[in-house]
């Protein structure tokens, strides 16, 4: 368990579900302790509410479930939109990525995956073309989530049908990727991130 005064995020060394919060914390410039493990030991498991990672500790407050962690960080740091309606629109995109897109590419059926990508990333691309942002008139967790999800699928390669997500097909999402990766905190995180399979 971390004894640091800054928040801590515990997850495996790979990108996986920890990537969303790691990129978010880096983008927002929030100091945190990035604790990586190779396995969930019995001692660690005993501290986990549901026996799984990632887990986020902010003082005495403990959260698990990757999308919940990201929402908490974003809400705490005013990155969930400017009002209640925008917050729920952000939440809608976060849920789509976690509930529909990620489970599908982990057990891919090419035809279904292609349609799923076109459905969601096509919608995201259209919204970015229209307004420049996925929700409201400023960058939110929704934009970051689409960037991280898009980038992770391409990182996973053809097993995840990554060729369907080209810069040519989704130029605005490609611009979103450049935007986040030009951020000093995100650029530093990417440079220091170890090469892993997942």
UniProtKB/Swiss-Prot annotation:
Cited Pfam families: GST_C_3, GST_N
Residues covered by the GST C-terminal domain: 83-198
Domain GST N-terminal: 5-81
UniProt catalytic activity: RX + glutathione = an S-substituted glutathione + a halide anion + H(+)
CDD domains for this protein: GST_C_Sigma_like (cd03192), GST_N_Sigma_like (cd03039)
Keywords: Acetylation, Transferase
One function term, GO molecular function aspect: glutathione transferase activity
Chain positions with N-acetylserine modification: 2
Catalytic class of the enzyme: transferase
UniProt-listed Enzyme Commission number(s): 2.5.1.18
Gene3D superfamilies in alphabetical order: 1.20.1050.130
Residue numbers binding glutathione: 11, 45, 52-53, 65-66
GO biological process: glutathione metabolic process; response to curcumin; slug development involved in sorocarp development
SUPFAM superfamilies: GST C-terminal domain-like, Thioredoxin-like
Keyword Secreted: no
Any single Gene Ontology cellular-component annotation: phagocytic vesicle
Family as reported in the entry's similarity comment: Belongs to the GST superfamily. Alpha family.
The protein's role, per its UniProt record: Conjugation of reduced glutathione to a wide number of exogenous and endogenous hydrophobic electrophiles.
Protein name: Putative glutathione S-transferase alpha-2
Organism listed in the record: Dictyostelium discoideum (Social amoeba)
């Amino acid at each position: 368990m971390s004894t640091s005064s800054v928040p801590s995020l515990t997850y495996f060394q790979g990108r996986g579900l920890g990537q969303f919060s790691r990129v978010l914390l880096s983008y927002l410039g929030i100091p945190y302790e990035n604790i990586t493990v190779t396995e969930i030991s019995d001692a660690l498991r005993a501290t986990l509410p549901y026996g799984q990672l990632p887990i986020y500790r902010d003082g005495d407050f403990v959260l698990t479930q990757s999308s919940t962690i990201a929402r908490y960080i974003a809400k705490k740091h005013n990155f969930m939109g400017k009002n209640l309606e925008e917050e729920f629109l952000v939440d809608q995109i976060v849920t789509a990525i976690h509930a529909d897109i990620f489970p599908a590419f982990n057990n891919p059926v090419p035809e279904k995956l292609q349609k799923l990508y076109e459905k969601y990333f096509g919608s995201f691309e259209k919204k970015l073309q229209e307004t420049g942002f996925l929700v409201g008139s400023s960058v939110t967790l929704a934009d970051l989530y689409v960037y991280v999800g898009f980038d992770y699928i391409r990182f996973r390669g053809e097993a995840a049908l990554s060729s369907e997500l080209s810069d040519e097909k989704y130029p605005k999402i490609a611009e979103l990727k450049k935007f986040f990766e030009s951020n000093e905190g995100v650029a530093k995180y990417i440079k220091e991130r170890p090469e892993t399979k997942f």
